[in-house]
Amino acid sequence: MSKSIYEQYLQAKADNPGKYARDLATLMGISEAELTHSRVSHDAKRLKGDARALLAALEAVGEVKAITRNTYAVHEQMGRYENQHLNGHAGLILNPRNLDLRLFLNQWASAFTLTEETRHGVRHSIQFFDHQGDALHKVYVTEQTDMPAWEALLAQFITTEIPELQLEPLSAPEVTEPTATDEAVDAEWRAMTDVHQFFQLLKRNNLTRQQAFRAVGNDLAYQVDNSSLTQLLNIAQQEQNEIMIFVGNRGCVQIFTGMIEKVTPHQDWINVFNQRFTLHLIETTIAESWITRKPTKDGFVTSLELFAADGTQIAQLYGQRTEGQPEQTQWRDEIARLNNKDIAA
């Protein structure tokens, strides 16, 4: 008799102590949402309602730890779900230097709450998944969380009905030819007055980010060595200027703003450990590192953008900047110290 998914999970967990649910699901050949669904009536419960309602209710629970990740990077931030703007398909939870999120809510498909026994004690969380079964965002209780408010939220949203997960395969992006010449893309780029116009430029011209970078002049985009992330984090830690680190997936982008306290490499990973923020990023998976300069009404905004071999954007880094103010000269100086990659090599 074949084992249930839950029994397979228990076996995989016993065989691979210390591995996270995401990794166990991969070993089992299923999505993390399917794995979590199998745990319902054990250490998980299904939550009803749409993501907006759940996110709005989280405002009452006080401080939590929020985790957003992709295959290559994990972004952990302590904060509160305050200052929410969740209209339409796009949403904001806007708390710079605290919990700062950009949400693409049409990607949010299911949610669960988990109560897990760990070697550090019981761990409570709410976890959101997309239509493909990948985790978009996770919310963990901390010592500062208002537990009566957390329990009240769960009482409101836990459902005894356990509908089947309606998973959809990820449609492969259409391979299309760019619709504009390199010269036209370069001219459009130079005409931008806001960094958010960049998405429209890509869409209009059927371009990926990297195709756009290759189309424009080296004063707008150029490649640097893949060690640049570690180099830049160390410089920012030494000089103590505020930077921004973006990590996202199909449905959520989480943003850190602040000074870097501690940078620690470990095996293939580069890690940042702050009191209220942690970054874990697999440095060996960085296939391309680009410096980009985008014009705004306040002058150019410079970023380091990191990509995996499959084209996934792993992370983006900026200097801290307030709307209406020019970019930090210190950030530009730090970027200028990075080693250019010899693209002809």
UniProtKB/Swiss-Prot annotation:
Family: To Y.pestis HmuS.
TM stretches of this protein: none
Cystine crosslinks: none
Function: Part of the binding-protein-dependent transport system for hemin.
InterPro entries named in the record: Heme_Transport_Util_sf, HemS/ChuX_dom
Keywords per UniProt: Ion transport, Iron, Iron transport, Transport
GO BP, one annotated term: iron ion transport
Gene designation: hemS
Signal peptide per UniProt: none
Domain of life: Bacteria
Protein name per its UniProtKB record: Hemin transport protein HemS
Pfam families: HemS (PF05171)
Keyword Ion transport: yes
